[in-house]
Amino acid sequence: MGQKIHPTGFRLAVTRNWSSRWYADDKDFGGMLAEDIRVREYLKKKLKSASVGRVVIERPAKNARITVYSARPGVVIGKRGEDIESLKADLQRLMGVPVHVNIEEIRKPETDAQLIADSISQQLEKRIMFRRAMKRAMQNAMRLGAQGIKIMSSGRLNGIEIARTEWYREGRVPLHTLKANIDYGTSEAHTTYGVIGIKVWVYKGDMLANGELPVETAAPREEERRPRRAPRGDRPDGARNGRPGGGRGRAPRKADAAPAPEGE
């Protein structure tokens, strides 16, 4: 069932962490969870042009700490920090507690699954061919270090009357392997023909249980490798297999005697 289950939920507490990190009593849990959902929807709408990959919400001691991972942190901060101050005020009004906002930059947006899905959905809304958008995203991800990528689009692709699903994959995407670092993202493209769903899986290598990358063993140096045997042509003739005449084990044929002259 590795093909069906959510890749992030499958790896929680193994190699991935939760995006909401707080504890609450049973009576408060539902309200705080709904609050988190409203905050995420607000940030998705407010920072639509800032290329936001993910949002982490923490609640330490009647406060809230929100970390926004963005490929364009300058758009979030704004000139002289004006935009982030207004964003902080809106979040405090939504959550009812003091809010501290951190901005983290995404170094390689071409390998972030959520940003890839959002980019493809924006291109589909601009009437770009879905195959071209998918293949271009795959090429960029593989060029910048991804070990594998899979993209799936579902809906009325190119405006056809019957909805279908198409997917492309390049490299390895081991969905059953728990230690595999699989980044997963989804998005929706609202076109004139209807909604098209995009799913993206990006394989970035294996991880240890603590979330760190495994230490790769160095390859043996050239001088430490076992010396190769000399080519067959460099060995002396007649001593190839310990037998005379090469490796066939037959002695060379003797020359035939010359015929006697006639009349003798």
From Swiss-Prot:
Residue numbers spanned by region Disordered: 214-264
SUPFAM superfamilies the record matches: Prokaryotic type KH domain (KH-domain type II), Ribosomal protein S3 C-terminal domain
Gene Ontology BP terms: translation
Classification via InterPro entries: KH_dom, KH_dom-like_a/b, KH_dom_type_2, KH_sf_prok-type, Ribosomal_S3_C_sf, Ribosomal_uS3_bac-typ, Ribosomal_uS3_C, Ribosomal_uS3_CS
One of the Pfam families matching this protein, by short name: Ribosomal_S3_C
GO CC aspect terms: cytosolic small ribosomal subunit
Subunit structure: Part of the 30S ribosomal subunit. Forms a tight complex with proteins S10 and S14.
This protein's name: Small ribosomal subunit protein uS3
Source organism of the structure: Bordetella avium (strain 197N)
